[in-house]
Amino acid sequence: MKIAANMKNDYYKSEIISLLLKNKDISSNRYSQTMAAMRGMKSDYYQSEILKKLIDPNVKDESEWSKLIDYAGNIHSDYYQSEVLIKIADEMPDSQSLKKQLNEAAKKIKSDYYYGEVVRETGK
């Protein structure tokens, strides 16, 4: 992950991170390491693709879900932000604190359409 963090090109950085994420035996702090490696990426598309790969049934710790929601809330594109937040809403455990955090992240979405998509998903 350290090598990927120092790369300048978003495409190659996302490819390296994606390859590393295929190895499910990565240490338990893979969320922090991956998000640190993603810092500085300008492409909302590549950020969202990596975040969606991090969202899997192996995410057990509420703090890991919280980190995913925090990062997703800072994606600039309303479309990609809503895509990631909807995937998180589908997979995350039923926790009031996580739902509240997800709704706060959704409020950063400027588009009424995409905001509504996320709110509908969290209301299920």
Language model: regions and residue ranges:
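Non-catalytic all-alpha helical scaffold/repeat segments
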Residues: 1-124
